[in-house]
């Protein structure tokens, strides 16, 4: 009966028979909630550590990927420049071949002309020798 009147006044006895303002059930629920919150905070902290580690790993992989990408772009550009150099060199060689062909044709014409002059000179010498 005394407990009921105290309960109505908002005072309660706990399991150790100490006078409390909170209802023992509410106090126990509060304690349980506090424990659950502590566990939740610990789990969140662990989760943040795991996520932080994953973010660092992903950042490292992104950096490595970017480095490899730059290397690949550099290699591709080098291959393109080598191909352009070869093409330019090929064009130079074609131009040199054309120039040499023209020079060869000039030499043939000059040779034919010199052969004709030589033949005329031999003919002139032969006629000169016959007239003597």
UniProtKB/Swiss-Prot annotation:
Entry superkingdom: Eukaryota
Keywords noted in UniProt: Cell projection, Cilium biogenesis/degradation, Coiled coil, Cytoplasm, Cytoskeleton, Differentiation, Golgi apparatus, Spermatogenesis
GO annotations of cellular component type: centriole; centrosome; ciliary basal body; ciliary base; cilium; cytoplasm; Golgi apparatus; intraciliary transport particle
Coiled-coil stretches: 87-112
GO term, biological process aspect, one: cell differentiation
Subcellular locations according to the entry: Golgi apparatus, cis-Golgi network; Cytoplasm, Cytoskeleton, Microtubule organizing center, Centrosome, Centriole; Cell projection, Cilium; Golgi apparatus
Main subcellular location of this protein, as a coarse class: Golgi
Cited PANTHER family: INTRAFLAGELLAR TRANSPORT PROTEIN 20 HOMOLOG (PTHR31978:SF1)
Its job: Involved in ciliary process assembly. May play a role in the trafficking of ciliary membrane proteins from the Golgi complex to the cilium. Regulates the platelet-derived growth factor receptor-alpha (PDGFRA) signaling pathway. Plays an important role in spermatogenesis, particularly spermiogenesis, when germ cells form flagella.
Name recorded for this polypeptide: Intraflagellar transport protein 20 homolog B
Organism field: Xenopus laevis
